[in-house]
Amino acid sequence: MHLEFEKAHDVLLEDVRDTVNIRQTHFSSPKRLANRWDHRLSDESLSQGASPLKNSVKTATTSVPIPLGVGRPASLFYPWQSMTMTGTKESNTRNPMTCNIGEAAFDISSALNYADPSGSTELVACFRENTRLIHNPPYQDWDTTLTCGSTSAIDIVLRMLCNRGDWILAEASTYTGTVMAAKAHGLNIQSIEMDEEGLLPVDLDNKLRYWDTSRSRKPFVLYTIPSGHNPTGITQSTARKAAIYQIAERHDLLVLEDDPYFFLRLDGSFSSLDINPPYSSFEKLRKSLPSSYLSLDKSGRVIRVDSTSKILAPGLRCGWLTASKQIVEIFENFAEVGPAPPSGPSQVMLYKLFVESWGQEGFANWLNHLSGEYKSRRDIMIAACSQHLPKGLCTWTTPTHGMFLWITIDLARHPDYSEKRENLSLDLEDKIYERAASYGVAVAKGSWFNVEACLDKVFFRITFVSTTCLDDLENGVKRLGAAVRDEFRFTQA
């Protein structure tokens, strides 16, 4: 069976290599228009429209009308007249950064007022340019809009595309926020098997080829976290993405690419921010980043979600979504009557940082600094795992992106293991989790992320970015190792 699986996988990859030029997709020309997705829209999308009251504000006129139509308090009633922000030394920003009444580009009166659902024009333009430079989507009519973070964006996209009772596709282990959002909307999740490169193309193709349409219509939304996958830390290779994209084309899937860890690379050199010619720091960054589904997308079937939460601060509640203009327009209609655009003060902070202070070069330097810090922490945690987790019982893979280690514990090594004990994995997970907490370390249970129960292994996710103290990385792993060893009655080091 395993050999048949590998042969099928090899055939699929050969098929992909014949149809997708992995190296040149970025620069293929001429670019076509995106597909239309009317046949993939939910009932809610078909009934959703733009707010006529808010649209009235956008109506172009030759002069500024007297504003008596929309209930927007005039700026003279706001209790603030300026904002001042000071960046850290590592951010290398122009300090202080201020926002006052009457500033030409983005004054505080605009920041504190209701805003267009796409967000600040200047800030959106910055993220759109970043997307063009890094991903260069190979079709014409793509666009970018702001979001209130990835979780909010994913929630809206699921509402846009799916009706209650539908199924979506996702990795066998995936982000809990998406699982909860799907369940809240009455959706089911079909798990797709994974290997050391992430999603398995053959399993995805087989699940779709042999889907039982008597239970529901065939899934057409694939949710994936391709870089520094949460929770496993896996990063999909370009060849793997190309294989998955080929299947998406074959089965007319929409790919929801959730990529908050894309910029957090953990391999390479981070020793200096001074980049010698011929490459700028941004160009060097671009060449070091993984490919994306968006960069392979010729038909507009990828909906890419980026976030500032993992690279700046989660409290900003701001990110950006890139997709075909049709999808972006529908997304903005949903956002307008839902979460609306991100907070105005958050947009001001990002505008001052990205547009007025950093630019693309400064952004690249910041990511270089952040990735270097995270790489050092990852290396400390990997060394601690090698020293303190029971050998032969615990395994893990060194991540090349992101912020997580996925610890796998072999359940068959437990003295009470029996194939007939269906609940042993969850029972043991609970005991290790509680014992670790009693020893003073908090970890994440693997079952929180698993779409379907795993009966022969126990998993825990740990992160190397949450603590401010480097010593906590080794001490935390040491305490987790003690909890595992005690629950397994394991005396070997």
Swiss-Prot record:
Q: Which GO terms describe its biological process?
A: aromatic amino acid family catabolic process; lysine biosynthetic process via aminoadipic acid; tyrosine biosynthetic process
Which pathway features in its UniProt record? Answer: Mycotoxin biosynthesis
Spell out the coiled coil positions from the record: none
Q: What terms describe the molecular function in GO for this protein?
A: 2-aminoadipate transaminase activity; aromatic-amino-acid transaminase activity; pyridoxal phosphate binding
Is Signal given among the entry's keywords? no
EC number(s) on record? 2.6.1.-
> Required cofactors, per record?
pyridoxal 5'-phosphate
Q: Which InterPro entries match?
A: Aminotransferase_I/II_large (IPR004839), Class-I_PLP-dep_aminotransf (IPR050859), PyrdxlP-dep_Trfase (IPR015424), PyrdxlP-dep_Trfase_major (IPR015421)
In terms of Gene3D superfamilies, this protein maps to:
Type I PLP-dependent aspartate aminotransferase-like (Major domain)
Question: What family does the entry list?
Answer: Belongs to the class-I pyridoxal-phosphate-dependent aminotransferase family.
| Function (record text) | Aminotransferase; part of the gene cluster that mediates the biosynthesis of swainsonine (SW), a cytotoxic fungal alkaloid and a potential cancer therapy drug. Swainsonine production occurs via a multibranched pathway and is dispensable for fungal colonization of plants and infection of insect hosts. The first step of swainsonine biosynthesis is the production of the precursor pipecolic acid (PA) via conversion of L-lysine (Lys) to 1-piperideine-6-carboxylate (P6C) by the aminotransferase swnA, the latter being further reduced to PA by the reductase swnR.
Q: What is this protein called?
A: Aminotransferase swnA
The species this protein was found in: Arthroderma benhamiae (strain ATCC MYA-4681 / CBS 112371) (Trichophyton mentagrophytes)
